[in-house]
Amino acid sequence: MLTPNLTEACRILDLDYHKVDLSEEGLVAICEALSDMGPSRIVITGLQQGDLIFNYIFEKNKTSELLSTRKIGGDRSGTGDVFSSIVTGALIQGQDFKTAVKRAVTFLDKAIAYTAQMEPPWNYGICFEEYLEEI
């Protein structure tokens, strides 16, 4: 499994971030190139458009999906770590990949909304402890 944001995916593949095609065909091409390096399950995280954030879920030889959620506040340190940890834990528990990703997105949506209310400095990450029992 690999869960890069777009910047990380571009660096891995030596692509110019500013020239990347973000259409579904472009995202499939990025994920297939990453998959050729080993991982069969990939999520390109944090694709922003307006008030939404998208995660592109790719699983080799399966139908891909673009999952959206609301953008809450500014960027936060550590969200990718929390995301990949929840997905990994859900996979270990036997959930399928798309369900695991949706579980992580739902958890982060709640935790980020709570963090926005608490207003800690951005580099403190997210206040996820409030929702740990839900995962």
Residue ranges: model-predicted function:
Residues 47, 79-81, 126:
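Gly/Ser/Thr-rich helix-start
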